[in-house]
């Protein structure tokens, strides 16, 4: 009994941390076949699940921190094993034991102190909006725009928040932001294993939404969309949530947004993991892009359910990935391979990783990386003044 007890305790800890899915696994190895890591280095999700089954989690190794939670393995699994849940359970156990990569520790500190992973002042969260006629949210407004952390602070991603605001203003949408009242949604730090910090961030956000009379939330990030839609209900919070790619289609179909300018470029669309595989949103972004005059949409071979992860999920966006192991480099090659001039996506993490990969190219101008809102902003053009000059 004495030799079995430690393993049983570990198994109980894994179950308590949400990793009980290992019980369904019969070690067929399909997860390893589809995992993007195996395109760039050896990695076995099957081995991690096996460790869970035997109560022998290797929480001090690097492997438990590699998973990007892209969703490819549960999609391919014939038994429907939630392999990502097993990985996250290992991370929770490791975090509780004080074992985690330094970047994750730094991020947790930043989130706890300022409500964002960058450690930027909370008081400046809404500063991006000052030049774009964006009002503070008040009860009764049509929608709350929740840009997320990186569009609020990162110089490249601020352009996405600005494009979104400009589009909403052009469409006559009555919207506002909460600015410094917002926290990070908490999705990625939860997947990185810090469950208690996630709960704190989520509860503070939910309180801010309720206190300000929020009913409908518009998001730029699929990670925010996923968390608000699928995880905040754990706290009995149910708000209507819509991703900008979906809302764009609604505005266009309702006649509130006119795409009049031609965009004569060949583009390809990258399905973000948390918009596509995790939430099934594939058609709306494509329907929006198809309505842009002059735009030619070319599909990559790995599209929709088979989309190649950019490498940013599961907390990996905060960790350095060595050159030669970046999924985003492979994705950029795929985009160029189909003759695309622009790689379009709808996720801040994807844009960050693709921009880094683009800048590492010998000819970094060979392809552009854009958010779908930036394309639509160009398609609606500048607002023309009334004939009387008003």
Question: Where does each model-flagged region fall?
Answer:
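Cofactor-cradling patches in redox/metallo enzymes
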Residues: 151-243, 274-291, 296-390
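Short, structured patches in soluble enzyme cores that scaffold and shape functional sites
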Residues: 147, 243-245, 271
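A broadly conserved sequence feature marking short terminus-proximal activation segments
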Residues: 1-3, 23-45, 277-281
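Iron-sulfur-cluster electron-transfer modules
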Residues: 19-22, 39, 49-220, 225-232, ...
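C-terminal amphipathic alpha-helical segment
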Residues: 253-289
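Short cysteine clusters
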Residues: 25-31, 35, 67-73, 77-78, ...
